[in-house]
Structure formats: C-alpha cells, structure tokens
C-alpha cells in the first residue's frame, strides 16, 4: 500500500485552515506513515513551500528519509536535482554500491501523457533510473471522456497500451528490468 503524493496545500492540523505545506508537514506525515503497519511505502505526500531555491526535491527527500524508515517514493528533475537525490541516497546507505544493493527510494514518474504521448523529461528520467538498475514506478493516468474514450473498457484498453509502451521502453533500455504493474 502506497500513500498519495505531492499535494501543494494541507489542512493545518492545529487550526483547521488550508495553507501551503512545508517541510515540517512532510516530517509529521513521514513519522505517521513510519508507524502505520498497513502502509508499505511513503510517497512524499505534500510539497515543501519552504524548500531553499534549487533544492526543492532534495529537501523533500531529505525530510522524508530522515523521519521514515520505510522506502520512499518521489521524483526529481533531470540533471543536478536528480544527481543530488542520488548523492543523498549514497550517503545514507554508506556508498553507491550499498545503495544499489538495497535501494530505498522508488523514483516515480508519469512519462505518458494520455492519449498515447510521452513526456520528454519524465521519459528521460525513467530511462536513466532504469539504466542504473534502480527502482522506478511509472503511472499512466487516462481519464475517461477527457484523455481516453468514455467507456470503462476503452479507458482500460488505452491505459494498458500506455503501460505496455513503458514496459517495452524499460526492457529496451535494460533487458530484465523488473516492473510494477
């Protein structure tokens, strides 16, 4: 079981009013998830409006990993952001080899833009993590009547076609890559 992710706002647990979420909210939720036996993986639930400029993803991962012993799922941007997340993971694990032997971050991307198109950045990142042999979780999100046909069977057919395209891409990138369907 995985938590939801990336909400920009939160209902303040003290005053009940909606506000931008912060790193402290990530920490609070991470501690809660850490103690819930029915949750297997923490998908960083909220954004961190207080993250330093240029360290948005790193700030989210650092806070989540500091406060939750379960695997963490999240995403980052190509380039420096992606590299800083990996450097954090290597430091926590003790080395790059130790992290790759037992990775605790699942990199989550939505490379398919329904209907049947692929986003360049997310696809690039999916291929990068696949090449590295690191866990990636890809989501396909066809919406019946909006980005896919109106009927349930047609939406399921399109969603499966989109997932199969991702599966084929991952297998072409690194044959034998495990997939989560």
State where each predicted segment sits.
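Glycine-rich, N-terminal phosphate-binding loop and its surrounding beta-alpha-beta segment
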Residues: 1-14
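Helix-rich catalytic cores of soluble enzyme domains
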Residues: 12-181
